[in-house]
Every structure is written in C-alpha cells, then in structure tokens.
C-alpha cells in the first residue's frame, strides 16, 4: 500500500483485500439494531449477521467484509465517560470486519490477518512488532500462529478465564449474556520501549505500549440463558479491527486523536471556536461527539428523555459544555457537521443526504440547553465551593442540576472529575426514583427470543394467499422461555408452525390474531412476531392440550385482517400525500398499523398547519375514491429502486423485494410515476376504494424534528365523523346558534373573555397598588440593611413583579421579599440591591423560602422568583423569614 496512509485509504484497502479473497462487500447496517431487542446501539460488526451465525437467516454468500458504524454510549457497552481522557476511547468508531459463515475457519482466518498486516502489497507492518494472544486451551490456534505463520512461541500469549467464571476471558468472546460466542485470537502492536505498558496478561497490560488492533473470534457456540454452550450449525469467523487504531499505527502516532480524521475535525472545531488546536481534551470530546451525534441522527434517532434519544441528548450536551469551557458563547456544535461531511461523506453518503436534518436537530438541542447551561454551571460552581480533591458532591445537588437545568448526571460527573470530586450516586438515585420511568433505562430492552427459538427450517408464510390452512405441523412449543413438549389448558406459551397464514409484526403492522386447532386442543393466538426465520405465535391454550409434532389447522381472524389491510394501505397513501404537500424532505420515522387505527411518524421541523392537514386528507381520499387496483410485484431491489420505490433507511432488505404500487399515475420529470410506490412485505387491499375513507384525527410533535399523524379508516372513520357532527350539534344547541355559526360565536366569546381578563388585570393592579401604598411603613432594619417582607392578598406573580419594580426604586440598598397570595397559590419574589449581594443573594432567599413552603424557585443574586402552594403553615414560614435573613446578614 502506497503512502500516505489516510484513514479513508486504509478503510478501502481493507475492503479491497477481502474482495480479492472472494468476500462480498456488505454495507454498514444502521446504528439502530434491526430486530435485536438486546442492543441499545450497534456496537460491533457482527451485529447485523447475528441471525446468520445462528443459522436462522441464510445469505447468498458465505464470506463478507464490512466497515461498520458503531456506537458505545449508554447501555452495557458505554465509553462516554472516558472520551477526552484517554488516547483510544470513542463514542463512535468504525469496525473493519471480515466474516465467514460456515466457510473458512481458523487456518484461513489467521492467514488473512497476517497477510493484510504484513504483506508489502498491503500494510507492510513490521512483523517483529506484532504479538498475539489466544485462549488458553486453543492449541489449534497456537499451532497455526507458531508453525504455519512462524511467530516465535514467546510472542504467543495464552489467556485463560481471567474474569471469575468459566469462559469469562479476554480471549473468549461473547456478544452478551446469550448468543453467539467462541474463543478468539487477538493481534497486538508494540509501540516501543519508550511507551509505558506491559504485555497482555501482565499487571501492566493497561499501558499504551502494546495495543490490540485485531480481534478474530472463532464462532463455535450459542450460549443459552442457563450458560449451556450449544454448537452453532457451522463454525464461523467474526473479526474486528478498529479503523482508528490501525490508522494511528500506519500514520506513526500513538493516540487515535492524532490521526488525520480527528486532526481535521479538531482543527475545524478550533477554527469555529477561534482558538488554537493544541490537542486539548475538550477539542477531542467535540471531534468525537460530532461523529456519534451526526450518525445517530442520520439513522433516525432524535433527542428525547428516554432510551436512545436520551443517550443522544447526553452526548450533545456534553459536547456543548466542552465548547462552553473553551469559550463558546453561542451555538457552535451544529457547525461541526459540514467538516464531518467533508471528512466522511464519501464513505457514508447518508451524512450528505441528511446534512440539513442533522444540523437543524443539533442546533435546536444546542439552543435549548443554552437556556439553562450558564445557570446550571453557576449553581454547580456554588455547590463546589469549599470542596477539595477527594470530596463528594451531594446527590441532591446533582439531581437538581438534572431536574432543573437539564444536566445529565454524567455531564455533572464530567465537570466534577476535573477537580477530583465524585458524586454521591446513591443519593442521586434516590432522588431519581420518582422519575425513573421517564429517564433513560438502558436495561429496558426485552429478552432476545432468537437465542431461544431453535427450529430446523424457517417458517413459510402463506398468508398472502389465504386466511386459513389445514394440516400445518407444530414444529416447536415454548413456555416461560423454555422448550416444551406440550401446553395444557390455561397455559400461556409460544407456538412455531412449519407454515402459517398469520402475518408476523413488521413494517409497522401489528401481528395477527386467530386460532390454532389440533385434535386435542385449541390455542388462542394473541400476537404473532418474527424471531430470525421463525414465525412465533404468542397466546394461551383455551381448551385441551396441544403437543409438538401434532398436525393443526391455523385460522386468522378475518375481520382483523381486513381492517388492518385497509389501514396499512392507507398509511402508504398518507406517506405519499405528506411528501406531496410538505416536500420530499419528509421521511418515515416509524409507523403503527392495527385494525383500529394507523399512526405515522415522519421528519418535519414544524407543526403541520390545519390547511395542510385538510389538503393531505383530501389527497388521500381522492386516491381512495379513484378506486384504482393495487399492484404487488417481486423484483430485484436494484430494479425496485430504479423504478422509484421508496425504501426505509436502516431497514434490512434481501436481494429480492416486494414492491407495492398504489394510486393514479402522474408525470414527474417527464416520467410516469404512480402516486405511491414503496417496498413493503405487509398486507394490503386489492383496490384503493376498499379503504372506504380516511380521517386524520390528530397531528402532534413527539420529538425534535419528528411529527406524528394518527388516522382512522372505513367504519372507524365514519364513527369519528359522526361523533364530531354530534359534538358540533350539541355545541350549537348550547350556544343557541345554527351549526355554521358556531365558530363565529366562539370567536366573539373569546374576544369578550380577553377583554374581561384585561379589566380584571387592571383591577388587580389597582388593588396591589393600594396595598403597596403603605408597604414602606413595614420596612425594618437588620444589620444596617433595610428589609421589607410583605404578603399581598389577591395579587399574582405578574403584579408582584410590577410592584417590585416600583418599590425597589423607593428603597435603595435594601432587601425586599414580596409574596402574592391568590387562588391558594403563593407567588414569591426577592430583590437584593447589588451593594448587598456580597452578604445575601436573592436566589438563596427564594430557594430557602420556596423549599420551606414546598415549592420551587431560584434566580440571580439580585433578583429571583418562585412559587409554592398555600398551606396551613405558610404564615408561620413567612413569619420566620426575617430571622433567617438576619442570620445570613450577621
């Protein structure tokens, strides 16, 4: 391989090498794992091949090569806290991998590694700098490395079970508690004696001298929940080499952040922030985080308060805080997207395609956090006053930063870490308990059935042609996650058939319902899902007993099938109408299709107006009224895309796909195009008229840049329209007008109410002014400072602020606390003259008072406000306030 060794060149060289070894290049899968509920994010190259390794998803190739996008932030695999503090931790990284599915095994796998690393045609790394590790009992791997490759035995290190359990070893790889696993061999590069660190397996192994660059897993087993190791259908190979690490070696540097890719991003960050790039930790954080954030957004993740969206929010806010640390006083992080696209957009075109979406999403989140960042940092600074290296910040303070200022706890920990201070996490967790359901919970993902379901042949779906089938075979039964020979009356379980008319949940459509009958029992199917190549029927035995290997009759509930098909077809028409009205930037983000309702989530950065909703609804119903036949064809995916069929980004498709065409044709760019053409494996109507009618029932925002439309069809739409008509008639009757006059009458009433509210506000201000006239008589002097504390009846927060402005002009160098008492609520406000804020702060007064009253509040040193519910002890708390203020002033 010729110089220079750019990261992009190394990525391409890896792919080219394995193509020359008859490997099929496979595109990186989405960072959102497909059909794998055990993973928060894709974190290894083998994730997309998991079911292939299990023998449940055959492919038309047995060798593959990939450059896989990976994220390790949140969940079990989490490197977020270390980014910026080490030379090699990242939230996002690229994993170069080659895979064998029952093809070659250890001999060829090891040989390919050595050839690519050391051959003059490829990387030409000095062989004397390479060490390898193997699993302690893997004599076969030892012989290949020593006898065939020629590595001296002293550079081959055996690693046993060093993690406290059988098969718990650095050289026995597992994907999780269950799933594919096996012994592995790892290649290490020696950076030289001038770098601290020891060989793998020694106490000094965590140093930077010997760095792992390639891990080759010999996939032989499928670990069960009870720890049993079952042989995989065919021994396979799964390898991974971090692009960032191998780039550091090829570019002659010791740390990943010194390679071309990161240097360019750090230079861009320094230019945006108008500082010099001196390899500051904060620049490393920004360069790393823009990669994770941009790729996550491109793959459909949006900031939120739970799950993947909360991890994204944490990463963005951590980057923003580090920019603030470097002097950023305005939004900056979104400006890093363009340099990233320039650096990685060729290898990953989705970055270029989604650039504006990524920038807008980041900028909105950045602007939202900016509103509270400065306040939160001030609060944290005050909490850290007096704490020293080794001390502990209270969990209560960390929770307040999270709850009030939007600081994820790991962001607070990141800041305190710089001063050697830790957080009382146990106390923080206690405060979080009340909000646990809304907060991030990386452990919320379900048990993975792919590690449980074991069938010899994939289930054949026959439901496109029929609703029922006699003479199907029960291939397997499961109860409580374990294989069963039979299920008896009242038992819940899972049934796997050799053939089934039941549609399994997919493409947004829910799984079907119905019955499976045998000669000895009846199984009520309550849901249908996929697990690898098996279709699994969830339900309960309602009569008798069913057994494995029995012959059965399977029947889908026809009314549910028909209603679901109408809603699914309507969803396609809705998608096309949205793109026509709102523009081609609209992309599907999710959907739910049941027999009762359809729900469609899509990317759009503002609410859809009522006029747009009406136009979208009208377009869909025009297509329904046209009553054109739907057309379903199977074709190669390349041909489908060429015809204009829309594919969902991140969805996994085979070489042959099912294409659904609906609606009347129109001419687009000189080419005849149908109203809707999409890839879809779901169930649909035969003609658009079968849908009947569509009625949009709601439109709302569910996350930054994501909108949701809900709608109903057929009789459910008729019912919705009739209910609306009835409500309108009742409203007209109450208002004593005709139905067409309801809107005008409501507008007139609203105008009148606004006028009355303004009159009431003016009256309240007069009452407040009348009460305030004598307030100066209540002033007392404490420690030489004029102090006024007064409660005003019938006065709200807005009037309190107006009064405060008036009184503080008449009472300089003072402390003023006003409490408005109206409608069982207390409005709190405090003003402290700037000349006095070195002795007492308004924010402290309000925090104390609100806390004692059971409310919330805070603010600046000179002005703060809050609120609290009125209670029986409110008067006593307020009466005690002068003494508290006096104590602070003394």
Curated annotation (Swiss-Prot):
It holds the Pfam family DHHA1. It catalyses: tRNA(Ala) + L-alanine + ATP = L-alanyl-tRNA(Ala) + AMP + diphosphate. GO terms for cellular component: cytosol. Binds 1 zinc ion per subunit. Its EC number is 6.1.1.7. It is an enzyme of class 6 (ligase). InterPro entries: aa-tRNA-synth_II/BPL/LPL, Ala-tRNA-lgiase_IIc, Ala-tRNA-ligase_IIc_anticod-bd, Ala-tRNA-synth_IIc_core, Ala-tRNA-synth_IIc_N, Ala-tRNA_ligase, Ala_tRNA_ligase_euk/bac, DHHA1_dom. GO terms for molecular function: alanine-tRNA ligase activity; aminoacyl-tRNA deacylase activity; ATP binding; tRNA binding; zinc ion binding. Its cofactor is Zn(2+). It is found in: Cytoplasm. Zn(2+) binds at residues 568, 572, 680, 684. Coiled coil: none annotated. GO terms for biological process: alanyl-tRNA aminoacylation; negative regulation of DNA-templated transcription. Keywords: Aminoacyl-tRNA synthetase, ATP-binding, Cytoplasm, Ligase, Metal-binding, Nucleotide-binding, Protein biosynthesis, RNA-binding, tRNA-binding, Zinc. It comes from the Bacteria. HAMAP family: Ala_tRNA_synth_B (MF_00036_B). PANTHER family: ALANINE--TRNA LIGASE, CYTOPLASMIC, ALANYL-TRNA SYNTHETASE. Consists of three domains; the N-terminal catalytic domain, the editing domain and the C-terminal C-Ala domain. The editing domain removes incorrectly charged amino acids, while the C-Ala domain, along with tRNA(Ala), serves as a bridge to cooperatively bring together the editing and aminoacylation centers thus stimulating deacylation of misacylated tRNAs. Belongs to the class-II aminoacyl-tRNA synthetase family. Catalyzes the attachment of alanine to tRNA(Ala) in a two-step reaction: alanine is first activated by ATP to form Ala-AMP and then transferred to the acceptor end of tRNA(Ala). Also edits incorrectly charged Ser-tRNA(Ala) and Gly-tRNA(Ala) via its editing domain. This is Alanine--tRNA ligase. It comes from Psychrobacter arcticus (strain DSM 17307 / VKM B-2377 / 273-4). The gene is alaS.
